[in-house]
């Protein structure tokens, strides 16, 4: 109710979009619905109302929203369900800042009205690149500080071959200073931190402890004579635990140590459940490289606009292109994602081509959208906060199953009615389907 009241006051129209739609590639697998009337053809349940809300903007609707049910056939986890609800919003003639302002004010209003929480008057912003560099994730939990630092310079001043090899290969050495925790971390507890790093492909976790100006344990012997220099550059002091990940791949070093940071936050009780720490992550890459298929994939989806400064060089180096993309993060969870959309049909065709759709395939899959653009699409953008995940965090839970009536379990099964279930042969025959063993 609070969401509807807020958006309606801003002249948003609540419009329902279809539930049976055309199957289009949007990232996750579609849930498919076979057609009885058209053998061999299928509807899909919407992963989001993305294309319909863009067509609404073309149709002259200035501001739209709906409380949308969405369906994605993907692996389950604690903060994810195969069916979920999002607050879907779209606006014409807006910039990124306009969308962010409307969204921030909505969260401030809703949190105050529902749970009496006063949120910050302005949510901080960080670029995707800085989020990876400082926190090792694009979903940083900023309820505690503990930022990662660059320590590639240690390859020069120490004798540790792991650091030297990583830097020589063009990689990185990342460091964390855990203040005052040297005495509390035994070798066994450090091995638990190392296990967290190895999940993200780190080869190991280097460490040492600061004690009386000297280093003890771990890589201490490789740092002899330069302890003071290291402590000064890392702002470390007596009683601190120093942790390092080195890797030939910069992102691996960052994400692996970022996982260690996240575990430390939990282990050291740094995650105050009564604090709501919102953060905007902006300037995402528009594309990401798919190693398995050797092609570029959209980082979010194919309808997000590149930043204007990249328009002339899109095809030359897709990996360098930043999109007009933004995510809202709350306490380490992504709670909303959005972008300024492409409204030029020729630019949309260029994006299709970069991600591997030839003109015929693009026309078959998305011709209805590019045809609509020909009638004059306004610049537009939007965002879609995930309602279930937001309620989970407001309630202090760690699984959205705790705030959903009749949730699916981690195997995507409904314990209440035991769906999915078998159907009889007559139903299958009516749908022109047969089950292969």
Segments from the language model and where they lie:
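Class II aminoacyl-tRNA synthetase catalytic cores and aaRS-like
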Residues: 1-437
